UniProtKB/Swiss-Prot annotation:
GO terms for molecular function: structural constituent of ribosome. GO terms for biological process: translation. The gene is rplS. InterPro entries: Ribosomal_bL19 (IPR001857), Ribosomal_bL19_CS (IPR018257), Ribosomal_bL19_sf (IPR038657), Translation_prot_SH3-like_sf (IPR008991). This is Large ribosomal subunit protein bL19. One of its GO terms (cellular component) is cytosolic large ribosomal subunit. Gene3D superfamilies: 2.30.30.790. It comes from Agrobacterium fabrum (strain C58 / ATCC 33970).
Amino acid sequence: MTNIIQQLEAEQAAKIEAKRTLPEFSPGDTLRVNVRVTEGNRTRVQAYEGVCIARSGGGLSESFTVRKISYGEGVERVFPIYSPLVEGVEIVRRGKVRRAKLYYLRDRRGKAARIVENTGTRARKLNESERQAAAEEKARLEAEKVAAAQALAAEKAAAEAAEAKAAEEAAKAAEATAE
């Protein structure tokens, strides 16, 4: 009875992760976050690319902050990890930093705000595993498309065969009435 909230949060997190999984990322990484945006009655997916400057919270309320420079102005956006509006996250490059919160980047401009790319073995492994997972997902989607196209072609062929059979029967009936 004591951990009912934790149990409910774990169930909700598992339910959301069944639909989509986010890659393992940390502050300093340059991310491309695909966000679902609703404008009037239209919905589209918009990419928001910037540097992850913080991850905070835990459980269902965990979130991450992404900072980018747009037309010379710094723009920060906080995304909840388990938000249904976050379609997916792609890691553009991994950064090498010594802090968990990179709020000092707010005061820096241009080259001073650069983050060194992490080329260590762990970063390489993570990048390779992400690429492999993306390739597997792409192959799975392609296989689904091919299967759907084949099913559609088979359905079309069956419909044409039934139509030809009906036309043949109609011709026989017309021939029988003509005699």
